[in-house]
Amino acid sequence: MFVLRCNLTAVGKGRPRFTRSGLAYTPKKTADFEKKVKSLAKEKMQSEERQVYAKSIPLKMTVFFYFAPPKSWSKKKRQSCIEEHLPKTTKCDLSNLIKCVEDAFNGVVYEDDSSVAELNLGKYYAEKDAFTVFVERLDMVDDFDESERSEQEEE
């Protein structure tokens, strides 16, 4: 299992921008975040002497994003939501957050993010902004036996 803990503020994948001539480009904030995460992941992969997961290997990815509560909240409310690990329901969307991390891991942790077959995500309040990523092989388990399979074929 590959585990990466980052004390960074997670950034959601920004929509592509277009130049006047019509060329698409990734917003700077998104590109900088992806570059930083890619660099940290590459460093960790090398230090652990890990191989990149092949595209043919199904993977399970679990990511927990942590955000500090707004400074505008009262001290009591901030402390309460941190202690209770309350889910964060405001921007940025989980789907945009995970896309940024998946893209940063392309070619570093796995060959392509299409090999991620299962996702487990969470977005919570914590004392400091951070995120933790777990990537592991997905064990394929056949949930039903041969008798159930033959019954399904008969129907």
Give residue spans per PLM region:
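Acidic, proline/glycine-enriched N-terminal capping motif
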Residues: 1-155
